[in-house]
UniProtKB/Swiss-Prot annotation:
Residues at the catalytic site: R236, E265, H297 (proton donor)
PROSITE patterns, A to Z: D_2_HYDROXYACID_DH_1 (PS00065), D_2_HYDROXYACID_DH_2 (PS00670), D_2_HYDROXYACID_DH_3 (PS00671)
Gene3D superfamilies: NAD(P)-binding Rossmann-like Domain
Organism lineage: Bacteria, Bacillati, Bacillota, Bacilli, Lactobacillales
EC number(s) reported in the record: 1.1.1.28
Protein name, entry field: D-lactate dehydrogenase
Catalyses which reaction(s): (R)-lactate + NAD(+) = pyruvate + NADH + H(+)
CDD domains referenced in this protein's UniProt entry, alphabetically: LDH (cd12186)
Assembly and oligomerization: Homodimer.
Length: 337
């Protein structure tokens, strides 16, 4: 019997895993809540493929251990592949898939909601209300329709975000090295990132973590932006030089910051730190600021998205096992390792 083994299955994923099992009774499905590491790779022994999801790196040692267990067909439940040692994967003959589209709306909605909350100074108002301070001033907000919203990256998520912000009445501009023909016809694109930085009141990032994009938000780019800019990062943590953003917040150049992804999030996000020593002073500082909204990489986290991530990953893995073309194969190109 064909067997698929899944790693790092969360409680919220179990209903959708069981739904897939029920629809594929001829497949043996087993799983663990543990991450895939060199030590846990042996759990997959006897399986034909594995389904995985983690921010932890898929190192050469991890991939070797998985191959030693007889498994080289690996399906990610997420989109990001920058944490895979591609050279080692290629050497070992791995076949890898991901889920590039699971719910653009989930992430775009989160980015739009958080941006609007920053503009309205909701966190400051909530803090006042909690203290029973019901005065209006000085917590006056800005309307979305009065902003120029700059969207960096016009893929699936970026386009949904654009439509949402236009629904509020904002003027939307965009930049992408790969222009969408329909958006180009409608005149959304500016000529350069510099142009977008200079024109936008709100800047939202929707691009991948590739070397050219690392720390694209830095001291130099922030200096080019309008005074009182709002920066939104619900994409990848390494797009933002966190220290540069803190300097921009301290100077008042940046009005507010939305951060769902963080360059040092591995080992910190998705853990309960209540009553314990918090391990990251910089992150703690951002969380405590009244004009910063931090969420722990949960922009994607809806029932709709989680179901798609589980079901699509298992479908991809089964196709790999059966020698069929998967819906979203990953090219084993060299990356950061």
């Amino acid at each position: 019997m064909t067997k698929v083994f899944a790693y790092a299955i969360r409680k919220d994923e179990e209903p959708f895993l069981n739904e897939w099992k029920e629809a594929h009774k001829d497949i043996d499905v087993d799983y663990t809540d543990k991450l895939l590491t060199p030590e846990t790779a042996k759990l997959a022994k006897g399986a034909d493929g594995v389904v995985v999801y983690q921010q932890l790196d898929y190192t050469a040692d991890t991939l070797q251990a998985l191959a030693d267990a007889g498994v080289t067909k690996m399906s990610l439940r997420n989109v990001g592949v920058d944490n895979i040692d591609m050279d080692k994967a290629k050497e070992l003959g791995f076949q890898i898939t991901n889920v590039p589209v699971y719910s653009p709306n989930a992430i775009a909605e989160h980015a739009a909601i958080q941006a609007a909350r920053v503009l309205r100074q909701d966190k400051r108002m909530d803090e006042k209300m909690a203290k029973r301070d019901l005065r209006w001033a000085p917590t006056i907000g800005r309307e979305v329709r009065d902003q120029v919203v700059g969207v960096v990256g016009t893929g699936h998520i970026g386009q949904v975000f654009m439509r949402i912000m236009e629904g509020f009445g904002a003027k939307v501009i965009a930049y992408d090295i790969f222009k969408n023909p329909e958006l180009e016809k409608k005149g959304y694109y500016v000529d350069s990132l510099d142009d977008l930085y200079k024109q936008a009141d709100v800047i939202s990032l929707h691009v991948p973590d590739v070397p050219a994009n690392v720390h694209m938000i830095n001291d130099k780019s922030i200096a080019e932006m309008k005074d009182g800019v709002v920066i939104v990062n619900c994409s990848r943590g390494r797009l933002v030089d966190t220290d540069a953003v803190i300097r921009g917040l301290d100077s008042g150049k940046i009005f507010g910051f939305v951060m769902d992804t963080y360059e040092d999030e591995v080992g910190v996000f998705n853990k309960d730190w209540e009553g314990k020593e918090f391990p990251d002073k910089r992150l703690a500082d951002l969380i405590d600021r009244p004009n910063v909204l931090v969420t722990p990489h949960t922009a994607f986290y809806t029932t709709h998205a989680v179901r798609n991530m589980v079901v699509k990953a298992f479908n991809n893995n089964l196709k790999l096992i059966n020698g069929e073309k998967p819906d979203s194969p990953v090219a084993l190109n060299k990356n950061k390792f």
